Amino acid sequence: MIYKGHHYILDASEAYGLCGHWLLKNMNEVATKAGTTVVFKTSVQLPVTGGSSPPGFTSVCLLDESHLTAHYYEDKGLLAMDVWKHR
């Protein structure tokens, strides 16, 4: 297997009261401090009109050859984060 980078997954429970824009701001700050280039970032409040997702948000920082994502399920207090950093 060829080494390509680091992949981290975080699942947290009892994470109540989170704000997507606050988390996105912190994700952007962490990515910048880690020396990566943020090429796009957004946070979407869920459910979107016509969608069937439970209440919460999805926040995304697309990085140069990497990504940092967060999915938050407000009613269940669940936060799932995924971080991939290329080399």
What are these regions (language model features)?
Residues 1-87:
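Polybasic/polar functional segments that serve as interface/processing modules
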